[in-house]
Amino acid sequence: KAESSTGSEAAAESVESRDDLLGLTAAEAKAMLADPLMILVNHTNQMPENYTFETAECGSKTAVNKTLQTVACNAFLELQKAAAAENVTVWMQSGYRSVSYQTNLYEKKTNYYKQQGYDDAKAKEMAAAIVNPPGYSEHNCGLAADLNSPEHTGLDEGFENTAAFRWL
C-alpha cells in the first residue's frame, strides 16, 4: 500500500483495529492522523521523500536558517509576541534546514570524528548522536526551531537557566 506524503494515510487506516486511542473515537483519531502536520521525524523515523510544504521567513537577523513551515512560522511569531508582552525575549537561532544543508552538517561532524581516528562506521554513529542524518532531522520538515535568548546564546542545556526557558 502506498503511503501519502506525510505517511499519515496508512496510520489512519490502522486506527480501525486499535483499542488504545487515548479516549478518542476512531473518527477523531483518523482526522488527527490525516493532518499533514502530524508527522514524526527523528533519528529512527525518516521524513517521507515527497513531503513538501511552503515556508515563511520568521527568524531573527542572526538566525542561521530563518524560515519554518508557514503554519509553524505564524505560531512562532505569536509565541514571540506573547513573550515580549511579558518582557521576555526569545528568538529563533535555527529553523528549517534543507536536506542538503543537513547533509553538510552531518558530513562535517562525521569527518571531524574521522580526523580523530575513528573508522567510518563509528564516526557516523558518533556524528548521529549530535547531528541527525539528512532526512531524520525535525528541522528538515520545517516544524522545528532552536530557540535562544539574550541570556544564553549557545545551543546547549544552558538555555534551561534563562527567563525565556522558564516562560516557555
Show where each model-derived region lies.
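Extracytoplasmic cell-surface/polysaccharide-interacting catalytic and binding patches
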Residues: 1-95, 99-168
